[in-house]
Amino acid sequence: MSFVVIIPARYASTRLPGKPLVDINGKPMIVHVLERARESGAERIIVATDHEDVARAVEAAGGEVCMTRADHQSGTERLAEVVEKCAFSDDTVIVNVQGDEPMIPATIIRQVADNLAQRQVGMATLAVPIHNAEEAFNPNAVKVVLDAEGYALYFSRATIPWDRDRFAEGLETVGDNFLRHLGIYGYRAGFIRRYVNWQASPLEHIEMLEQLRVLWYGEKIHVAVAQEVPGTGVDTPEDLERVRAEMR
């Protein structure tokens, strides 16, 4: 099964300026992500960026670049520009790998592509079980609840589902019903074309979760449990130091 990986790599970052190019053990971060994507068996890998310095780093590592506008409001909008520039057919399977995930396992890139290809749905993603209360109550850990067939009912920064009886006894433990959403998505190219024409939903603005737009318009997102748990992503200088230590 063939699929394409697109890696959005926006240069500007409030907490970590020039984030795609930060050095991790002798290589720019975006090159580490590119290497993980190559291990997935993708037919084609494209880094979508708005900055020439990022493009040069990727091309120096033998990667393909698509220059995109700097004014996109989301990573999916950047994907849509690449889809149009590359004229992908509507049934092309595209995996969106975040440019700040240098430790992402290649197995889960492949998994989300396979997951999408096996279903008549426009979008698929992954999640991992939550086993501790700190993560369950952390608004930066996005939770997802599923229906009986593994389709998302809702994504939230809140603690869902709310375990009434257990939480009434204290917050020290959580049960086995919590899933943390991972920020990796598989799409069919035709779905991306439709998505970017939808208006943002009220729920999306409240939670600041772009995927809620899909549910708002009555579409389905399939969610599988990831075969591997990805390593630390890089959002802050502290994350960067942690990743450097873990990747030594």
From Swiss-Prot:
Recorded GO MF terms: 3-deoxy-manno-octulosonate cytidylyltransferase activity
Catalytic activity, reaction form: 3-deoxy-alpha-D-manno-oct-2-ulosonate + CTP = CMP-3-deoxy-beta-D-manno-octulosonate + diphosphate
Any Pfam family hit: CTP_transf_3
Pathway, per record: Nucleotide-sugar biosynthesis; CMP-3-deoxy-D-manno-octulosonate biosynthesis; CMP-3-deoxy-D-manno-octulosonate from 3-deoxy-D-manno-octulosonate and CTP: step 1/1; Bacterial outer membrane biogenesis; lipopolysaccharide biosynthesis
Biological process (GO), any one: CMP-keto-3-deoxy-D-manno-octulosonic acid biosynthetic process
Localization (cell): Cytoplasm
Record carries keyword Glycosyltransferase: no
UniProt cross-references to CDD domains, sorted A to Z: CMP-KDO-Synthetase
Highest taxon above the source species: Bacteria
Enzyme class name: transferase
Family named by the database record: Belongs to the KdsB family.
Cited function: Activates KDO (a required 8-carbon sugar) for incorporation into bacterial lipopolysaccharide in Gram-negative bacteria.
Protein name: 3-deoxy-manno-octulosonate cytidylyltransferase
Organism: Shigella boydii serotype 18 (strain CDC 3083-94 / BS512)
Organism lineage: Bacteria, Pseudomonadati, Pseudomonadota, Gammaproteobacteria, Enterobacterales
